């Protein structure tokens, strides 16, 4: 049985690409035709590519790996959060902070700050601090939860990235490539497919299309994991992300 059907793709509007004047020639092999100034994506190829991506993500999950879901454009934010959480994975759906992967030592301090401020509220520290200081602490807390809440429990380098719109997420892609983290991505007709290891040619602007495809990647993780929890995965890996980043960065420099 196919991972996804042509009917599902058509109903979600996956086949609608960008205007013909806004395209990347490298996407030509994934384009079926042009209609009213808009490129139509070849859904037969999308079906095949979804299956390839699904099997790859499933294999990662079977081995106890993790996937970082990244989608900060408005059309992707909700689906990225919901599907990553459903699959017990990590996500960034507001803004990619520079160094999220390549400089995790600094990022981890900000993540740790979330817990520190929570503890201050729980142990009564807020009650003895000036009201102005408490307001500032709450603002700081809200900021870090907004940008980093989705990777709060990420203790090791993700096994792969899943991104919606490589043009929008170019910084995330650059960091992943530097650290040799494979990338699965929803790639529209205006994007460069060469940046992505597992290309899913599809409309990256329609909420239904993004939801459908992101959901399929979450399904792959759940099928592969078969009940293994994030806590068990983290315990099995037992790797500190900041240390792993340093090792990979050194390997890249030496190469």
Swiss-Prot record:
Q: Which InterPro entries match?
A: Ribosomal_uS2, Ribosomal_uS2_bac/mit/plastid, Ribosomal_uS2_CS, Ribosomal_uS2_flav_dom_sf
SUPFAM superfamilies (alphabetical): Ribosomal protein S2
Which stretches of sequence are listed as region Disordered?
Answer: 233-255
Q: Which domain of life is it from?
A: Bacteria
Provide the GO MF annotations for this entry: structural constituent of ribosome
Per the record, GO CC terms? cytosolic small ribosomal subunit
Zinc among keywords: no
A Pfam family: Ribosomal_S2
Q: Where is the composition biased (Basic and acidic residues)?
A: 245-255
Look up the coiled coil feature and give its residue ranges.
none
Q: What is this protein called?
A: Small ribosomal subunit protein uS2
Which PROSITE patterns does this UniProt record tie to the protein? RIBOSOMAL_S2_1 (PS00962), RIBOSOMAL_S2_2 (PS00963)
Question: Which family does this protein fall into?
Answer: Belongs to the universal ribosomal protein uS2 family.
One of the GO BP terms on file: translation
Q: Which UniProt keywords apply?
A: Ribonucleoprotein, Ribosomal protein
Native organism = Macrococcus caseolyticus (strain JCSC5402) (Macrococcoides caseolyticum)
Its taxonomic path starts at: Bacteria, Bacillati, Bacillota, Bacilli, Bacillales
């Amino acid at each position: 049985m196919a991972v996804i059907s042509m009917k599902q793709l058509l109903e979600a509007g996956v086949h609608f690409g960008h205007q013909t004047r806004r395209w990347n020639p490298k996407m030509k092999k994934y384009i079926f035709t042009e209609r009213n100034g808009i490129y139509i994506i070849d859904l037969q190829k999308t079906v095949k590519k979804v299956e390839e991506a699904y099997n790859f993500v499933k294999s990662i999950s079977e081995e106890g790996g993790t996937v970082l879901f990244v989608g900060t454009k408005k059309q992707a934010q909700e689906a990225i959060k919901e599907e990553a959480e459903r699959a017990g994975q990590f996500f960034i759906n507001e803004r990619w902070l520079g160094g999220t992967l390549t400089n995790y030592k600094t990022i981890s301090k900000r993540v740790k700050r979330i817990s520190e401020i929570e503890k201050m509220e729980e142990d009564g520290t807020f009650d003895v601090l000036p009201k102005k200081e408490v307001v500032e602490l709450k603002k700081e807390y809200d900021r870090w939860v907004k940008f980093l809440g989705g990777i709060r429990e990420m203790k090791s380098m993700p096994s792969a990235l899943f991104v919606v719109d490589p043009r929008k997420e170019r910084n995330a892609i650059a960091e992943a490539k530097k650290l040799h983290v494979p990338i699965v991505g929803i790639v529209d007709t205006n994007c460069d497919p060469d940046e992505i290891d597992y290309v899913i040619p599809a409309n990256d602007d329609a909420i239904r299309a993004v939801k459908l495809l992101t959901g399929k990647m979450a399904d792959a993780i759940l099928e592969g994991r078969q009940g293994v929890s994030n806590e068990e995965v983290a315990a099995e890996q037992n790797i500190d992300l900041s240390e792993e980043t340093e090792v990979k960065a050194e390997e890249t420099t030496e190469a």
